[in-house]
From Swiss-Prot:
Its EC number(s): 2.4.-.-
GO BP of this protein: biosynthetic process
Organism in which the protein naturally occurs: Rickettsia conorii (strain ATCC VR-613 / Malish 7)
Residues making up the signal peptide according to the UniProt record: none
Enzyme class: transferase
Keyword Nucleus attached: no
Gene3D superfamilies: Spore Coat Polysaccharide Biosynthesis Protein SpsA, Chain A
Gene Ontology terms, MF aspect: hexosyltransferase activity
Keyword Zinc-finger included in the entry's annotation: no
UniProt similarity note: Belongs to the glycosyltransferase 2 family.
Pfam families cross-referenced by the UniProt entry: Glycos_transf_2
Protein name: Uncharacterized glycosyltransferase RC0461
Length: 604
């Protein structure tokens, strides 16, 4: 064990004032004063303030027995806050340390905390820690360790430990400057004067958690909070005032978002306190945060106006009412009069017309004009379920995700159910696996406006541009997945058998090119090989299905130009994919990028 002689002298050898307020405390105060006198750090003053005790002079006799070892003051009864204020006004130290008359300091309490100050650049930091809980006779009950409740980094976020009930006033070592800058204890509050003042001070002061247990806190029936009848009501009022006074920035700093802070505060109050009114207020405020959150729904449109109108109507019936719809007309050639008429009827719908440049450019225009906190994408031929935005918004706020997607239903051209796709199981840290398997469907995606402002769709890509962006986002962020079908994705032709192999193959090659052409993503090029190998397998299955169908419809297949074209594209696609795989393996990434571009011009 290191002795005091072995320890270096404190560079910062400041005077610390230990203030002991007492009312009728002759039973315990001697232990408290003795623990203060036993401090290994000697540059201290001990101030005992008798708050008008009515115990036939017992409290005063105990205090006077210490002579000039302590500074003793007597005042008329005014409550704990008034006694502390009296001591503060008479203290000479640069730092304040509160010791309740029924609590006990460990001998190294002050020295240890001053040592911590020596290691910190900012000497205006408040030091605090956990404590040992003891009974009336001084027997240990248990240890209260804040670091078992919150991670260390959160314990150093001003206000958060206080609002999770983790601050014991007697564990603090606090610069006295804050009494001059912020104020002293509110003497009108009999039992909550401490948290009231800590709240005000912690809003402006840095804090530092130390895991050492340095105080013993006595739990007994004579404590003020147990004897004062309106304690719970006083606490309800105090906590409600906290919730009203906190700024959005403070809530974000503590828990990542106002919604998350409010719901976690409600959970804390419900599980750890009887303060029902404050708990109900936190829940009400959390719901209001969701209601006040605007969602920007971006719908690119190119012809198929009847489907686009269906898509718009699926947004208009959302249970979450705070939204805007951005219709991006990507140079439609069909009659759009019915579409524009709907847009003019609802102020929440904004209509933009642009020349045809593809879905990526259309979505980017929507992103640049969006004003919501979150963006949700909806293709003009797809649909939202009515609670889609409500469920996804709550999920993202509760889990602090900046990007999420959900499972979905496939429907045919007439809106009939085909199957469920449980893509929402694809969640968490999905990179680099997302390169070879990206199940994220466009109308299931929601993300923050900031995320998409910083990550626009690649406009030079018209097929596979969505997967390219999802891969890029997943390489830097965790992906939130909801395994609940909240959107309907329309499949042209009603079945995957008739998908466009041309578009499919171009999309795969575009994704491969995008990955290989990115300095960071290209490090994971083997995943593109796996992606293309999987594509070959899928195309082979497609070809087999077509062959089976052809046998039962020989004359139809012989005379159908579209079917013959699909078969040709399937063959060309497999050739291109296999050439890509061979090129990556034999010639490397850069040569493959150049070759891909030549393939696209020659074969597609």
């Amino acid at each position: 064990m290191t002795t005091r002689k072995d320890k270096p002298l404190n560079i910062y050898h400041t005077l610390v004032s230990i203030i002991i307020p007492v009312y009728n405390g002759a039973n315990y105060m001697k232990e408290a004063i003795n623990s203060a006198l036993a401090q290994t750090y000697k540059n201290i003053e001990i101030i005992v303030v008798n708050d008008g005790s009515k115990d036939n002079g017992e409290t005063e006799r105990v205090a006077l027995s210490y002579g000039d070892k302590i500074r003793y003051f007597y005042k008329e009864n005014g409550g704990c806050g008034s006694a502390l204020n009296y001591g503060i006004k008479n203290m000479q130290g640069e730092y304040f340390s509160w010791l309740s008359h029924d609590d006990i300091y460990y001998p190294n309490k002050i020295e240890h905390q001053v040592d911590i100050l020596n290691k910190l650049d900012n000497k205006d930091t408040i030091i605090y820690g956990g404590y040992e809980l003891i009974d009336e006779k001084g027997n240990s009950l248990r240890y209260i360790k804040p670091d078992s409740v919150l991670p260390i980094n959160k314990l150093n976020i001003s206000l958060l430990p206080l609002l999770r009930g983790l601050i014991h006033g007697c564990s603090l070592l606090m610069p006295a400057k804050y009494f001059h800058e912020v104020g002293i204890f509110n003497e009108a509050l009999p039992t909550t004067q401490d948290y009231d003042l800590w709240f005000k001070i912690f809003r402006v002061a840095p804090i530092h958690f130390d895991e050492s247990i340095l105080i013993k806190s006595r739990f007994h029936s004579e404590q003020g909070s147990k004897k004062i009848s309106n304690h719970n009501e006083e606490c309800n009022v105090l906590w409600s005032s906290f919730l009203h006074e906190l700024t959005e920035e403070e809530m974000i700093k503590m828990e990542g978002s106002p919604y998350l802070f409010l719901t976690r505060t409600a959970t804390f109050l419900s599980n750890n306190t009887p303060y029902k009114k404050a708990c109900d207020l936190a829940n009400t405020m959390a719901k209001q945060v969701l209601n006040d959150t605007k969602i920007s729904v971006i719908i690119p449109v190119y012809n198929r106006i009847n489907w686009a109108i269906e898509a718009i109507k699926s947004v208009l019936i959302q249970t979450h009412k705070n939204f805007e719809i951005l219709i991006i007309d990507d140079g439609s050639t069909d009659d759009i009069s019915e579409l524009t008429a709907i847009c003019k009827k609802d102020k929440r719908i904004k209509y933009f017309h642009k020349k045809n440049e593809g879905p990526a450019a259309a979505r980017n225009l929507g992103i640049k004009n969006a004003i919501g906190k979150y963006i949700a994408f909806l293709d003009s031929d797809d649909l939202f379920y009515k609670d889609k935005i409500e469920i996804q918004l709550k999920f993202m706020e509760e889990n602090n995700f900046i990007f999420s997607h959900t499972s979905y239903h496939k429907i045919n051209e007439k809106g009939k159910y085909i199957e469920s796709v449980h893509s929402g199981l694809f969640s968490g840290n999905v990179f680099p696996q997302v390169i070879q398997t990206c199940p994220i469907a466009m109308p299931t995606v929601m993300g923050t406006l900031t995320l998409f402002q910083e990550n626009l769709f690649p406009e030079n890509i018209r097929s596979g541009e969505d997967c390219c962006l999802w891969i890029s986002i997943a390489s830097k962020n965790s992906i939130g997945g909801i395994d609940k079908e909240l959107s309907k994705v329309r499949i042209s032709g009603g079945t995957n058998t008739f998908m466009d192999p041309n578009k499919y193959s171009v999309g795969l090659i575009n994704i491969t090119s995008y990955v290989l052409n990115d300095a960071y993503l290209s490090k994971f090029s083997p995943f593109t090989i796996n992606l293309l190998l999987a594509a070959v397998t899928q195309l082979r299955l497609l070809e087999n299905k077509n062959e089976d169908y052809k046998k039962s419809n020989i004359s139809f297949f012989k005379n159908n130009y579209v079917i013959q074209k699909i078969r040709t594209y399937c063959f060309v696609t497999k050739i291109l994919i296999l050439l890509t795989i061979t090129s990556i393996r034999q010639e490397g990434i850069r040569a493959t990028i150049s070759r891909i571009q030549r393939w696209l011009k020659k074969h597609i």
